[in-house]
């Protein structure tokens, strides 16, 4: 399995250790993989050949089929996603958190929420947010890496085999959380920017770390994950909306679930405005994309050479020569007669 990628190399963990007990190899990949467009990602199961045990090197010759692929961060065969959101420093942004949750839901993987830095917020605020997130349909872990709150409970929840991706905005404490779960990692951390109150990027690449039977991926922070492209699919990525519509479907197939008559989501719901914001962005993006396509077609049409009437086109020189030769042969045969 691929544990990490850097430059043109990948670190691969072996299912069976080598003759010298080596369990990891630093590998390149076959040129054929690159030419065929097969991209190696962290979490991929691969076949390694041309092993040099003394140097600890090998070559990735083939990729095994994936169960799934998380696009950002690019991790394959994911079992669970932990979306980390800080209550303070930086303050929790419901829309930003929703974007991360929608992106995670779109992968088809089990999703949970980790509320970090709970020691910096009043207890009523922590409890209110935990209750709110459960209403959204998520299991919640309230933790503080600095105070050690909730760390053991989170470690216990990671006791099953599989790949767990830890993702979230910059500065929410993902690396600090992993350091608390496994102190020997000593991952680099940094304080939130004092002037902008934004997180600083400390993790530069994705890497898998063992945590009991699980493999946990620390990922670089980013603040604006992309939403799925299809507006019609958005409802599937809001668990509370999905749950309600399964019990009380809408009267209309094309309902936007914004409180219109006949909608299964009668009345306001907690994330209605957040859902509406995401939906509006997707609809605007689609309209903008259609407009760009129409404009491109129009401009291309303006440059296109007009099609002439077939009767006015100049004939093919080859066909003209064939007809001329045929006519000459016919004349010759007529003279012979």
Language model segments and positions:
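Switch/coupling subdomain of P-loop NTPase systems
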Residues: 46, 78, 95-109
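Helix-rich effector regions associated with P-loop NTPase G domains
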Residues: 8, 36-45, 50-51, 64-74, ...
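N-terminal accessory targeting/assembly segments
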Residues: 1-94
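General small-molecule cofactor/ligand-binding pocket signal
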Residues: 61, 141, 217
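Conserved beta-strand/loop subsegment of P-loop NTPase cores
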Residues: 78-85, 106-118, 137-142
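Canonical P-loop GTPase G-domain recognition
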Residues: 120-172
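Catalytic P-loop NTPase motifs of RecA-like helicase/translocase cores
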Residues: 91, 121, 149, 223-225
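Walker A/P-loop
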Residues: 175-176, 180
């Amino acid at each position: 399995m691929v544990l990490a990628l850097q430059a043109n190399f990948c670190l691969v963990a072996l299912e069976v250790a080598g003759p010298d007990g080596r369990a990891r190899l630093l590998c390149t990949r076959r040129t054929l993989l690159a030419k065929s467009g097969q991209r190696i990602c962290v979490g991929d199961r691969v076949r390694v050949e041309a092993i040099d045990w003394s140097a600890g090197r090998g070559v990735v010759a083939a990729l095994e089929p994936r169960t799934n692929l998380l696009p950002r961060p690019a991790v394959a065969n994911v079992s669970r996603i932990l979306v980390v959101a800080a209550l303070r420093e930086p303050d929790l942004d419901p829309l930003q958190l929703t974007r991360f949750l929608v992106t995670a839901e779109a992968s088809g993987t089990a999703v949970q929420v980790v509320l970090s830095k709970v020691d910096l917020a009043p207890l009523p605020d922590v409890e209110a947010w935990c209750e709110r997130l459960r209403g959204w349909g998520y299991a919640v872990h309230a933790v503080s890496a600095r105070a050690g709150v909730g760390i053991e409970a989170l470690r216990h929840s990671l006791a099953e085999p599989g790949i767990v991706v830890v993702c979230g905005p910059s500065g929410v404490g993902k690396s600090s959380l992993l350091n608390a779960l496994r102190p020997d990692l000593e991952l680099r951390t940094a304080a939130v920017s004092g002037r902008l109150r934004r997180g600083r990027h400390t993790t530069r690449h994705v890497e898998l770390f063992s945590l009991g039977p699980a493999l946990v991926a620390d990922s670089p922070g980013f603040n604006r994950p992309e939403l799925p492209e299809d507006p019609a699919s958005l409802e599937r990525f809001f668990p509370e909306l999905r749950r309600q519509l399964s019990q009380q479907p809408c009267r209309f197939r094309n309902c936007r679930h914004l409180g219109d008559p006949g909608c299964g989501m009668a009345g306001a719901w907690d994330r209605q405005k957040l859902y509406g914001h995401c939906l509006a962005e997707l609809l605007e993006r689609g309209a903008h994309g259609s407009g760009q396509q129409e404009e491109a077609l129009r401009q291309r049409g303006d440059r296109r050479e007009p099609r002439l009437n077939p009767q006015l086109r100049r004939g093919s020189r080859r066909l003209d020569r064939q007809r001329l030769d045929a006519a000459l042969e016919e004349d010759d045969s007529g003279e012979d007669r």
